[in-house]
């Protein structure tokens, strides 16, 4: 299941044109023009899962969300779903962005805490939550930074998900 916030459904089109998945085999669903973590997105996810599980009994289902998806509504939904069980929650985090925009990742937690104290939400809230609620975290774009910088970024965000 692929989620793309855009109506263009770029991710869905790219994945649908592979040898591994296709809609005709009932092993692929794309949910576009909505956030899968929103109320309407959860309804679309529910429908997609029903369609997938009607004709198949897959060993696993991979759910690829938009980068702007909030993890907690998805975790709650999947935890309560009668036919599936959540085994892993993987977050991909852009190491270059953390390095450039958050001083090697060191400013992410203080800015997130500032939002919590003010009762506001910012992109830092979403980013911190995506790190906090995952059980697997991959730092991406590591090839663009020296190894020691990637290590420093990893150390800086580690308190969010020890």
Please provide the spans of the model-predicted regions.
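G-domain G4 guanine-recognition motif of GTPases
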Residues: 64-66, 92-97, 134-150
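A short helix->loop->beta-strand "cap" motif at the edges of active sites that frequently abuts
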Residues: 87, 161-162
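Structured helix-beta-strand junction loops
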Residues: 133-134, 160
């Amino acid at each position: 299941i692929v989620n793309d916030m855009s109506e263009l459904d770029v991710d869905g089109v790219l994945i649908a044109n592979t040898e591994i998945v296709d809609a005709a085999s009932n092993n692929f669903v794309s949910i576009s023009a909505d956030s899968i973590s929103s109320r309407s997105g959860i309804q679309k996810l529910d429908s997609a899962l029903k369609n997938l599980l009607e004709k198949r009994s897959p060993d696993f289902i991979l759910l690829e969300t938009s980068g702007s998806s909030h993890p907690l509504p998805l975790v709650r939904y999947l935890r309560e779903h009668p036919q599936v069980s959540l085994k892993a929650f993987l977050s991909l985090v852009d190491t270059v962005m953390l390095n450039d925009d958050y001083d090697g990742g060191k400013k992410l937690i203080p800015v997130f805490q500032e939002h919590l104290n003010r009762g506001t939400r910012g992109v830092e809230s979403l980013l911190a939550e995506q790190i906090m609620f995952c059980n697997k975290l991959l730092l991406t774009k590591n090839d663009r930074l020296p190894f020691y910088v990637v290590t420093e970024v990893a150390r800086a965000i580690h308190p969010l998900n020890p």
